[in-house]
Design a protein with these regions (language model features):
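N-terminal ligand-binding/catalytic initiation module
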Residues: 1-158, 379, 385
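Solvent-exposed alpha-helices and their adjacent loops that cap or buttress functional pockets
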Residues: 15, 58-63, 99-100, 125-127, ...
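Glycine-rich phosphate/diphosphate-binding loop of Rossmann-like nucleotide-binding domains
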Residues: 77, 84-102, 154, 160, ...
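General beta-strand structural signal in soluble alpha/beta enzymes
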Residues: 108, 134-137, 158-161, 192, ...
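Adenosine-phosphate binding glycine-rich loop
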Residues: 161, 286-392
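Rossmann-like adenosine-cofactor binding region
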Residues: 235-306, 311-313
């Protein structure tokens, strides 16, 4: 079977269609009366109504179903700092996925600045147009402050998908992997390799879900509270709530006796011989792209029980598209002001529930994006959580 060159196919598609998106009117504009209703003079009445009651913007405009996909082009996929223009195809792709999987309209916005204050100001300036903000490909540690301040200062949900979308899908995979392995979430030991935005979010969501023993490993080794004064603030903060034994050392040291490895780091950093030192039935989530921390065949040969990656050509693909469309669908439907941790945990449980227990196996712990109505199940889970936590 001939291997497809997806890079060339993507270039050909972009050239043929001139991008992935278009704007389509929902209302007819075929006659003079149509024009008078859609634009002047009729539209003035709609604007006047909103001027009297700003909450009507949700009922009378596209705000209620529209999300901004915003990037500064600094940390795009595995390409790095490629700038605003080069980030545009990725943002278009994200917007297309919102529409395909959750019927959410979204607008790609790339910012020609990488200054934290300017990014925050720009997002706040355009926020009245949108029902939610999806931050994309903004590098750590800047992304932490940008997201936190926007959440605090805006009255619409703000979500950095590179952090939390990844964490939510990994958590969904963990729920089902533990069922297959016969382990309890409160008893396991987890090692998260990678102290960037995704790794720190994984650690925090695992803690919220009931994991008690987590160590985060970065280039300096195991993050420990006793070394907090030598760490950057975001690493010091995670060290204070993980690694309760205050262990230090390398990734190899951290893995001894661990049940779960979560890699959001770099290719080939997990050695097969280290898996042999892990607990019985080790679970490996190796999600570096395009090449994982260890390839599944190597991990399985070394004794891994379950292996997941970010790639579609291996079993158990851990893909953000399982999460973000449904999360925003649920948040928009309830007009939630925030996407809380409870809503994110609910989303993970919703994703996990899509595979019946009878169908779970070592090679089937996470659904495919095209299996059933993933986004609607996630959206329903998020809606219930929003209502339960008074975010709706």
């Amino acid at each position: 079977m001939e291997k497809k060159d997806f890079n060339q196919l993507a270039l050909d598609q972009a050239k043929e269609f001139g991008g992935k998106l278009s704007v389509v009117s929902k209302v007819p504009i075929e006659t003079r009366d149509d024009l008078s209703i859609a634009y002047t003079p009729g539209v003035g009445a709609v604007s006047s109504a909103i001027a009297k009651d700003k909450s009507l913007v949700y009922d009378l405009t596209t705000k209620k179903n529209t999300v901004a996909v915003i990037s500064d082009g600094l940390a795009v996929l595995g390409l790095g700092n490629i700038g605003a223009e080069a980030a545009m195809p990725v943002m278009e792709g994200k917007a297309a996925l919102f529409k395909r999987f959750a019927k959410v309209d979204s607008i790609p916005i790339v910012l020609d600045t990488q200054d934290t204050e300017e990014i925050i100001a720009a997002v706040k300036a355009v926020a009245p147009t949108f029902g939610g903000i999806n931050l994309e490909d903004i590098s750590a540690p800047r992304c932490f402050e940008i997201e936190a301040r926007l959440i605090e200062e805006l009255d619409i949900p703000v979500f950095h998908d590179d952090q939390h979308g990844t964490a939510i899908v990994v958590l969904a995979a963990l729920y089902n992997a533990l069922k297959v392995a016969g382990k309890d979430i409160g008893d396991i030991r987890v090692v998260v390799n990678g102290g960037g935005s995704a790794g720190l979010s994984v650690a925090r969501r695992f803690l919220a879900a009931g994991v008690k023993h987590i160590m985060v490993v970065d280039k300096v080794g195991i993050l420990a509270e006793k070394n907090a004064d030598q760490l950057p603030p975001h690493h010091a903060a995670i060290a204070k709530i993980t690694n309760h034994e205050n262990r230090t050392g390398t990734l190899e040291d951290a893995l001894q006796g661990a049940d779960v490895f979560v890699g959001v780091s770099a290719p080939h950093v997990l050695k097969p011989e280290w898996i042999k030192t892990m607990a019985d039935k080790p679970i490996i989530f190796a999600m570096a792209n395009p090449e994982p921390e260890i390839f599944p065949d190597e991990a399985l040969a070394a004794g891994a029980y379950i292996v997941g990656t970010g790639r579609s050509d291996f079993a158990n693909q851990i893909n953000n598209v399982l999460a973000f469309p449904g999360i925003f669908r649920g948040a928009l439907d309830t007009r939630a002001r925030k996407i809380t941790i409870d809503m994110q945990i609910a989303a993970a449980k919703g994703i996990a529930s899509l595979i019946p227990d009878a169908e779970l196996s070592t090679t089937n712990i996470i659904p495919n994006a095209f299996d059933g109505d993933v986004a609607e199940v996630v959206a329903e889970s998020v809606r219930h959580a929003a209502e339960a936590t008074a975010e709706a």
